[in-house]
């Protein structure tokens, strides 16, 4: 069995770790960084870029650079959050045939799972490069407040990337695993996780290697991206006030504002003021325009105060559900890059009444926890038991559109619960089971996970048939539902796949595309390498012809020129084999030149060689040594 890796698939950045013996290790990527931007881009010629290379070109290619894609995963196009996101990103968000939110570039649609898979592939390659062996299994983290559709879509992303996802683990729980691995003390901890796109808070009880989640709460559309957007809105408003030009209508300018906003936000965690300079941000009839302004930490805090306050209500709910008060929390662990912001640390300190623990790296702790869980599943990590919970209540729609709960939120998973229902009308021979997830009293106000029909119910007065509905939630938080007619024993089981979601056929198609893309990337790399080799050979040969051309016959020189022209022509194309063949031809043609160069370096023959040797002999000078007393030398110095 190969190594199982732990991956934190983040909104802004992703990270991969692995267990080395009893210690988790974060793996650096090809660029030497410990985290990788969760950004995927497609260039003019169709090349796919992932991570830092994609981020670097975002300003000049905004409509084909996909970032914060995690905010769309498992969401429908009509979801209010999707519609909100449409106004915030420069790329196209489109409606897929199944009603899901997908993204598009150059007329081609991609599911968020597919884009996420490209990032996961990069993580997989990073691990394989470090371990020196293929990696096929992983533990992937998700926000604790992700619903079933979002969890399933994340699992699909892993499958598309060529990974068997052994476990989906909640981010705050992973952070708690990393935090508590080496600590033998017991107690109640709160994990406050504010990342790039999502917010979670979990209350856990730790003791004797048991990590028991008591409650979880959060907001899957609150994170660093929103903080960046507040700065972008402020910069655009200030520029419009001064120059009368609306930068939000210009995709390129908007991308530059976004990059500047992220940089300013990071700087304001350590500095009290930062300067934003964006020369040539736009132009009008009067000429180019530049943006230059100072942003203080106090101003930034006022711009985002409501966002920070939005994290407090989930904290209150989590404490209430766990049945503990803030002063009963022994330690508050901060996770996610946004928790570096001093104001957030102050708010957390005020709410919980204690200084938050800053001993973990907020960008890496989740991946480390995922690696620990991978180690548990692999048998490398002993005496660790993880008990997680389902974040949202699960139930079905019953008469009058009421949401009838079968499993309450914060129930420890895996879990199974059954309840018997009946028909609403006389002689009803089929029932539609509509499965929802959420906390509202009416089914329509909650998230529809999926629906199915149980048919062939024998005719009977209403209320007589007994239909047993069973909910089964696995350790990944993914739901299976069974409906059984107790009279006939007829059963219908579905693994919840939202009315949207990817079908098995679509997943297989995307897996094949990912494999084809990997092959295409390899071909592209090979093309670049043979082109570089060909161009280097032309340069070296032309230089040699200038220096030693008079040492070879005109016929040989003509042959070299013809071979250079043929290779140049091949380099203008994309055929690797042709370039290789023409490169070999040029190497053959220039062999005579090589012989001439070798002869020239040997001199004009044996006599010249002998003369040179004699000259060298005559040049030898006898050394005249003089002994210097060490003490004497020191005195002179």
From Swiss-Prot:
Molecular function as annotated in GO: ATP binding; ATP-dependent protein folding chaperone; unfolded protein binding
Region feature (Disordered): 600-637
Species: Methylobacterium nodulans (strain LMG 21967 / CNCM I-2342 / ORS 2060)
Superkingdom in the source lineage: Bacteria
Record PANTHER family: HEAT SHOCK PROTEIN 70KDA (PTHR19375)
Acidic residues bias (residue ranges): 621-630
InterPro entries linked: ATPase_NBD (IPR043129), Chaperone_DnaK (IPR012725), Heat_shock_70_CS (IPR018181), HSP70_C_sf (IPR029048), HSP70_peptide-bd_sf (IPR029047), Hsp_70_fam (IPR013126)
Protein name: Chaperone protein DnaK
Role description: Acts as a chaperone.
Induction section of the entry: By stress conditions e.g. heat shock.
Residue positions where Phosphothreonine is found in the record: 198
Keyword set includes Nucleotide-binding: yes
UniProt similarity note: Belongs to the heat shock protein 70 family.
Keywords carried by this UniProt record: ATP-binding, Chaperone, Nucleotide-binding, Phosphoprotein, Stress response
Keyword set includes Magnesium: no
